[in-house]
From Swiss-Prot:
GO molecular function annotations of the record: DNA-binding transcription factor activity; transcription cis-regulatory region binding
Recorded superkingdom: Bacteria
DNA-binding region, residues: 18-37
Gene3D superfamilies associated with the record: 3.40.190.290, Winged helix-like DNA-binding domain superfamily/Winged helix DNA-binding domain
Induction: Maximally expressed at stationary phase.
CC annotations in GO: cytoplasm
An example Gene Ontology biological process: division septum assembly
Name by which UniProt lists this protein: HTH-type transcriptional regulator YofA
PANTHER family cross-referenced by the UniProt entry: HTH-TYPE TRANSCRIPTIONAL REGULATOR, HTH-TYPE TRANSCRIPTIONAL REGULATOR GLTR
Lineage of the species this protein comes from: Bacteria, Bacillati, Bacillota, Bacilli, Bacillales
Subcellular location: Cytoplasm
C-alpha cells in the first residue's frame, strides 16, 4: 500500500465519485479507477459500493478512511517539518574588504535576506591580512579577500576580478602622479606591497603616506588634492566623488585584483552558510 494509493482512495471517498476525484487530483479517470481497484485487490476486500449515484464506502472502507486521514496528515506534517528544517536560519558572520562591502556585496546581501529572513547576517570589514586571521580564529564564518590565498587550512572560491587603478585630482601621467603623497587605509592595506614595488621600479623613495579609515574618505581626500591613491576601479566608479578624480591605468602586471571567498576547510557548513555559498555563485554570473 502506497501513500499515493491512499491519497486517491481518500479523494474518491470524499468526493463520492471517480470522475470528481480525478478532476480534483488532475488525474486521468481511468488511472483513478485502476488504482482503487488495485488497492482493493491488495487488501482483498471491497472498499466501495458502486452505484448509479457514485461511490459509497463499505464498512471496511470507512475503517480504512480513518487511518488514511491520519497517515496522509502525518506525511503532510513530516514534509512541512522537513522543508522548514532546510530553511536557512541562525547567525551568519561574514568578513569583507571595505571595497567589496560598498560595491558588490550590498545588492546580493539584500537579495539574500529578502529570501531568507531567518538568517542573522553580520558583516565585518577589514583588510585581507586581518580577515584571513579572523577566518582562522573562527571569528567570522567566511570572508571576501584579495587572492589567491595560500593556506593549508583554508578553502577559497573565486568570486570576481577587478582592476587596480591610480587616482588623482588632476590630469597627468601615472609616473607623475606617483610623486604625490599616497592615501591609504591603515596598516595592513592589501595594496601597499604593490605600491612599494611600483615606486621602487620608478626610482621613488621615502614616499609620504597619509592614512584614512574609510574608502570614501580616501577618494574625497584625493579629489581635494591631498595626494593620490591606488584603489579598485569598481570602488572608484561607484563613488559619489567619481567626477572629481582622474583615473590612471597601471602597468599590466599591477592591474589585476582577484577577489575570493575563503572559509576553513574544517568549518561545519550550516544551511545558512551553504545558501550563502550558493549566493556567491550567483555573483559570478
Amino acid at each position: 500500500m502506497e501513500s499515493g494509493d491512499l491519497k486517491i482512495f481518500q479523494a474518491v471517498a470524499r468526493e463520492g465519485s471517480i470522475t470528481k476525484a480525478a478532476q480534483m487530483l488532475n488525474y486521468v479517470q481511468s488511472n483513478v479507477t485502476a488504482r482503487v481497484h488495485n488497492l482493493e485487490e491488495d487488501l482483498n476486500i471491497r472498499l466501495f459500493h458502486r452505484t448509479n449515484r457514485g461511490m459509497k464506502l463499505t464498512a471496511a472502507g470507512e475503517n480504512l478512511l480513518q487511518y488514511a486521514d491520519q497517515v496522509l496528515s502525518l506525511l503532510d506534517q513530516a514534509e512541512k517539518s522537513t522543508r522548514m528544517s532546510r530553511q536557512p536560519k541562525g547567525p551568519l558572520r561574514i568578513g569583507s574588504l571595505e571595497t567589496m562591502a560598498v560595491t558588490h556585496l550590498p545588492e546580493h546581501a539584500a537579495s539574500f535576506l529578502r529570501r531568507f529572513p531567518e538568517v542573522d547576517l553580520s558583516v565585518n570589514t577589514a583588510d585581507t591580512h586581518h580577515l584571513i586571521q579572523q577566518v582562522l580564529d573562527h571569528k567570522v564564518d567566511g570572508a571576501f579577500v584579495y587572492g589567491p590565498v595560500e593556506h593549508a587550512a583554508v578553502r577559497q572560491l573565486h568570486v570576481s576580478h577587478d582592476e587596480l587603478v591610480l587616482i588623482s585630482s588632476r590630469e597627468g601621467t601615472a609616473e607623475d602622479m606617483l610623486q604625490q603623497p599616497m592615501l591609504f587605509f591603515g596598516a595592513g592595506c592589501s595594496h601597499r606591497d604593490r605600491v612599494k614595488r611600483l615606486l621602487e621600479e620608478a626610482g621613488i623613495h621615502n614616499q609620504k603616506i597619509i592614512e584614512f579609515g574609510t574608502l570614501e574618505a580616501i577618494i574625497k581626500g584625493v579629489s581635494a588634492g591631498m595626494g593620490t591613491a591606488l584603489l579598485p576601479k569598481s570602488a572608484v566608479d561607484g563613488s559619489e566623488h567619481r567626477t572629481n578624480v582622474w583615473i590612471h591605468q597601471l602597468p599590466p602586471s599591477y592591474q589585476d585584483l582577484e577577489i575570493v571567498f575563503i572559509y576553513r576547510k574544517d568549518f561545519f557548513i550550516t544551511s545558512a552558510f551553504q545558501t550563502f555559498l550558493d549566493e556567491i555563485n550567483e555573483m559570478k554570473r
